[in-house]
């Protein structure tokens, strides 16, 4: 029990330190704290596809996400039960969130008039069905996409499915790097509790990736 109490104390102290680092480097944020940690400086920047310096559309979102996942740092804490930490707020790195080529000026008067919280250009809170992912797993999602890709043959449909496959495989690559790191850390662990925890992290993520 004492071992677990110490692990909890260690995690709490690291969390407080990580939150303080975010405040010092990024300023105060009037929103959720999230589980994010500060990323290394100058490791990754967005890939614009528009003269305004931002990116829009399926292709650009896929290119940016996969580019980020391919270099996203691995994070494993031997005291923690989870692998990985979110470091980048990709959507907030865009200078603009709505493509100016598709004006919605005709809506702005009523948005202001009725004091609407406008979601145009936002990219989250679409209420995805997580049960699908839990039931199928990452490889199951790939098989489902490949199934529909095999029966819908238009160029647009084929491209749409190929982008989804790229995204899933980039996530799998990120998970695999954590698996590899967990095994490396377990091999050099000096106490059985940490070693077993790291091995369990690796094995659980091997199941998740498949």
PLM regions with names:
Residues 1-148:
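Long, non-catalytic protein-protein interaction scaffolds
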Residues 134, 138-210:
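Structured, charged N-terminal subsegments at the starts of enzyme catalytic cores
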């Amino acid at each position: 029990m004492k071992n677990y109490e110490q692990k909890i104390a260690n995690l709490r102290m690291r969390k407080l330190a990580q939150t303080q680092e975010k405040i010092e480097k990024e300023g105060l944020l009037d929103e959720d704290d999230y589980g994010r940690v500060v990323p290394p400086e100058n490791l990754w920047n967005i890939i614009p596809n528009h003269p305004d310096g931002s990116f829009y559309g399926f292709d650009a979102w896929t290119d940016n996400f996969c580019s980020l996942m391919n270099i996203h740092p691995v994070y494993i804490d031997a005291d923690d039960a989870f692998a990985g930490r979110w470091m980048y707020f990709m959507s907030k790195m865009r200078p603009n969130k709505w493509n100016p080529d598709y004006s919605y000026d005709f809506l702005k008067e009523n948005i202001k008039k009725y004091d609407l919280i406008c979601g145009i250009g936002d990219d989250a809170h679409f209420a995805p069905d997580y049960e699908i992912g839990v039931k199928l797993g990452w490889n199951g999602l790939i098989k489902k996409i490949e199934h529909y890709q095999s029966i819908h043959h238009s160029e647009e449909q084929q491209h749409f499915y190929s982008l989804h496959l790229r995204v899933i495989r980039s996530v799998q690559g990120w998970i695999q790097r954590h698996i590899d790191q967990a095994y490396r850390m377990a091999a050099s662990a000096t106490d059985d509790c940490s070693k077993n925890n790291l091995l369990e992290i690796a094995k659980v993520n091997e199941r998740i990736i498949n």
